[in-house]
Structure formats: C-alpha cells, structure tokens
C-alpha cells in the first residue's frame, strides 16, 4: 500500500551518510513559516539562498549555512519545502534534524499552537512519493530518480536522466493518446449500431492498429536497451578445470581478481565481478571446474561443481571455455561432450577456445561461431567483448535510450499481446466489437501502469520503499 500519513509534514537528512563538505536537511509540508523563523531567525524570501545561522532553542547558532524556501507548488514535492544546507558532519546534521523536530513541536509565540503540528522523520522515498502524488513526476520519472542515483555507468546515468526528463513517459503517453482515439471510435460504433456510417472503416481502424503496434515495437526496443543498462547481463564462465576461466575473468576485468595457478581445480567456489563494456554492466561469474559425470575428487570439489551448475542455471549467457592445447585428447574430449550435453536449454552459450598462444600450429578447425583467444596475451578479447554485447542485444550508438525496469518491459509486452489480439479481432469479417473494445482497454491500462495512471497501491508502496531516506 502507499506510504502512510502522506499529509503529515516530514523532515529528513537528504544527503548520503558520512562526512562531507555540505549536508542537507529537507522539510516538506504545509505552513512552514513559523518553523523557518524559529530555526533561521527570520522569514526567508522564496526561491532565494539566504546565508546565516541555524539556531537552537536558546537562540545560539548550531551552524551557519544556506537556507532556501520553496512555496507550494513550485518545489520538488509540490508542497512547501525548506532546505537547510549546512556543513556535512553526521553529528551536526542529526542536531539540525532534531532541532527541526523540536522547533515544530514547540508553541508559536503568536498563536500558542505547535509551529508545525505532526512533523515526523520521512520514510524512504517519501519526498519523491509526494512529488508523484502531487503530479510533479509520473511513476516512470520517479523511478528514474532512484535509477539515476544508483547508476553504475555513464551510459546508465545518461539514460536515467532522459527518463527523468520525461523521454520515456512522453512516448508512453503518445501511445496512450492514440489508443484513446481508437477506443473512442470502437465505443462509438458499439453505442450507435443503427448509424449507417461504419466508424471503423471510415477511420481506418486496422491501419491505426498496425501503426500503434509499430510505434510500440520501437518503444519496446529502446526500453530493452535501457533495461540492459540498468540490470546488466549475467555471464558465467564454465568449463573443465584449468582451461583458463580465472585467467579470462582477470583479463576481462583488467585486474587480478581470481587466483591463477597451473594446478587444476584452483577455483573451488564462485568468484563474481561486474565489468563494463561500452557502458553495459556485465556480471561475470567464474566457477569451479566441471568434470564428466560430476566425478569429483573430494567433497569440496563436489560442492564447488554443484554451485557451478547452479550458477549456469541462473545465467543469461554461458562462456563455455575450452583448452586448445588439450583438444584431441580422448578423455578431455569425452568430458567436453558430457558437459555440453548437460548445459541447460534456453541459455545462450558462447564456445570460446582459450590458450591460442600455446596451441600447436594447425590445430583442429573450429566451428564458425566459436571464438579463438588467449586470456594470457589478450588475443581475441575484443572480439569476445563485441560478441557479448551482441548477445545482450546492445546496439552501439543507440539514440534516445532511456532507463527502463523489468516491470516496464512486462507492461509493454502485455500491451503488445493485447494489440495482437485486437488486430486479429479487427481482421475478422464478423469482428466482435465488444471483444475488440476490451482488448484495447486492457492495452490502455497496461500502458497506464508504466506512468502510474493505473497502478495498484501495493506496487507504488514497493517502488518508493526502495528509495533512500531524504529522497
């Protein structure tokens, strides 16, 4: 459900925990005037930065800094907002937070009433929730605030910035408007069956549906790119012991993350690292070596192989690593076939043949899609990076990509499915207009869930609870 008591005035430290040059305490609510005078010692001119002391209950300065007052509705939350920009010490900011709560509860000298009744510390995400409730942001923009804060790459940050500026929402709203127009035509045909004019034929309903579906496909493609920037791709390195999985992880990461020795079975557990390729995060997992029929040499290796298979089952892609120097060995080749047969269906597998620098000249020819590289020298690594991006569906230089989440993709895909059924109904000679109208309504509602127009309260509460306090 929605966060509770969203009419109460709220206060929180808006900057990250820890020491810094500047820290901010933010207050949002109605009627902040008496609180402002108590803490700042004077009224503040709206939307101007005022330098001066922040006062305790005895009128002594706690600190000096900037105070800014934003009257409603011209603020982040759409309510009246006060921001106190002080020095960024954790103890100092807690003092200012406590002072705001204390001053709010004390009676105003003129009215005798509390200066700001009900002021409380904000819940996580409550400032942004109020911005959503007061129509300052739609839901996709509100989520983009959190994604911008959490962005781990420049590309993700820029895409989140586009979503915050409304790039995603505008495209969704355009689709919704076109669906509304078509729904009106269908409803008119249902409501006035005696009219000689066929509203659907006159308005080219089938053509409209096709054009809406085409536009939706374009938005979905951009959303998939944005989701990739946010979520990344989980890639598992798999193969027999001592084929160079840890060396490849180190080469891709550009750092010595995993222990590398000539001894087979050095890696006994998963080692994970997030790397970036052209701004796309890849979560690469190095796993313990696999053996034919899980023929472990000891209990530790058996557990390690179990975890390796578990990681493979959760992967978006598997780099199945082979050792070129051992190709042709009967025991090695038999184990390769056993492992390959046990790889789960539906997982993308890249066949990568390592140790090209040490392989004998004239080594066996590889399959057309297989890659040949050397984790030690770096030969073939750029080709592997490009293949991983292709596998992820990333298109270099994509324009207008906005950040997107899994729920956005699900909503867009649901919309597409309803449009497919709507087009099938519209193409029938005996089209059931009531069924067509229902499919259009469901498509319309699915789109509305992205921006928050038709979103259950439970989902809203879950979204905003994931924000940091003060945002």
UniProtKB/Swiss-Prot annotation:
What Gene Ontology biological process does one annotation of this record name? tRNA wobble uridine modification
Q: Would the keyword Hydrolase turn up in this protein's UniProt record? A: yes
Per UniProt, GTP binds at 242-247, 261-267, 286-289, 354-357, 374-376
Binding of K(+): at which residues?
A: 242, 261, 263, 266
Question: What CDD domains would the database entry show?
Answer: trmE, TrmE_N
- Cofactor binding annotation: Binds 1 potassium ion per subunit.
Please tell me whether the keyword DNA repair is annotated for this protein: no
* A GO molecular function held by the record: GTPase activity
Q: Which cofactors is this protein said to need?
A: K(+)
Q: Which InterPro entries match?
A: G_TrmE, GTP-bd, GTP-bd_TrmE_N, GTPase_MnmE, MnmE_dom2, MnmE_helical, P-loop_NTPase, Small_GTP-bd
Residue ranges of domain TrmE-type G in the record: 232-393
Summarize where Mg(2+) binds, as residue positions.
Answer: 246, 267
What Enzyme Commission number(s) apply to this enzyme? Answer: 3.6.-.-
Q: Name one GO cellular component term.
A: cytosol
Q: Which domain of life is it from?
A: Bacteria
Please name the PANTHER family in this protein's record: TRNA MODIFICATION GTPASE GTPBP3, TRNA MODIFICATION GTPASE GTPBP3, MITOCHONDRIAL
Q: Assembly and partners?
A: Homodimer. Heterotetramer of two MnmE and two MnmG subunits.
Q: What is this protein called?
A: tRNA modification GTPase MnmE
């Amino acid at each position: 459900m929605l966060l509770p008591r969203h009419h109460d005035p709220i206060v929180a430290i808006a900057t990250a925990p820890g020491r810094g040059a500047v820290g901010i305490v933010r207050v949002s609510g109605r009627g902040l005037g008496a609180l402002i005078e108590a803490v700042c010692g004077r009224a503040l001119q709206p939307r101007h930065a005022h330098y001066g002391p922040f006062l305790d209950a005895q009128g002594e300065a706690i600190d000096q800094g900037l105070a800014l007052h934003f009257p409603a509705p011209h603020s982040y939350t759409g309510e009246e907002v006060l921001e106190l920009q002080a020095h960024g010490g954790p103890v100092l900011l807690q003092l200012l937070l406590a002072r705001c709560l204390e001053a709010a509860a004390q009676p105003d000298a003129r009215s005798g009433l509390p200066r700001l009744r009900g002021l409380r510390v904000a819940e996580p995400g409550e400032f942004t929730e109020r911005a959503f409730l007061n129509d300052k942001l739609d839901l996709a923009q509100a989520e983009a605030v959190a994604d911008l804060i959490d962005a781990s790459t420049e590309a993700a940050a820029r895409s989140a910035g586009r979503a915050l500026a409304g790039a995603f929402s505008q495209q969704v709203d355009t689709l919704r408007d076109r669906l509304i127009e078509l729904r009106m035509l269908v409803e008119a045909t249902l409501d006035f069956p005696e009219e000689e004019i066929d509203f659907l034929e006159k308005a080219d309903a089938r053509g409209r549906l096709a054009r809406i579906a085409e536009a939706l496909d374009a938005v979905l493609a951009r959303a998939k790119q944005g989701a990739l920037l946010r979520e990344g791709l989980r890639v598992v390195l798999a193969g027999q012991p001592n084929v160079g999985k840890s060396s490849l992880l180190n080469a891709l990461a550009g750092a010595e993350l995993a222990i590398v020795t000539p001894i087979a079975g050095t890696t006994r557990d998963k080692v994970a690292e997030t790397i970036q390729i052209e701004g796309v995060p890849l979560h690469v997992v190095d796993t313990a070596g696999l053996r034919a029929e899980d023929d472990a040499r000891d209990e530790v290796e058996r557990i390690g192989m179990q975890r390796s298979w578990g990681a493979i089952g959760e992967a978006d892609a598997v780099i199945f690593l082979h050792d070129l120097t051992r190709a042709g060995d009967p025991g090695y080749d038999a184990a390769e076939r056993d492992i390959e047969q046990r790889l789960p269906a539906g997982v993308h597998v890249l066949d990568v043949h390592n140790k090209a620098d040490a392989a004998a000249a004239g080594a066996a020819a590889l399959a057309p899609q297989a890659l040949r590289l050397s984790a030690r020298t770096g030969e073939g690594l750029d080709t592997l990076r490009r293949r991983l991006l292709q596998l992820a569906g990333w298109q270099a230089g994509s324009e207008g990509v906005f950040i997107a989440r899994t729920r956005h993709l699900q909503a867009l895909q649901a919309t597409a499915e309803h449009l497919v059924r709507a087009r099938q109904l519209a193409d029938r000679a005996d089209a059931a207009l009531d069924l067509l109208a229902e499919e259009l309504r469901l498509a319309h509602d699915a789109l509305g869930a992205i921006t928050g127009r038709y979103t259950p309260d439970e989902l809203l509460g879950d979204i905003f609870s994931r924000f940091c306090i003060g945002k």
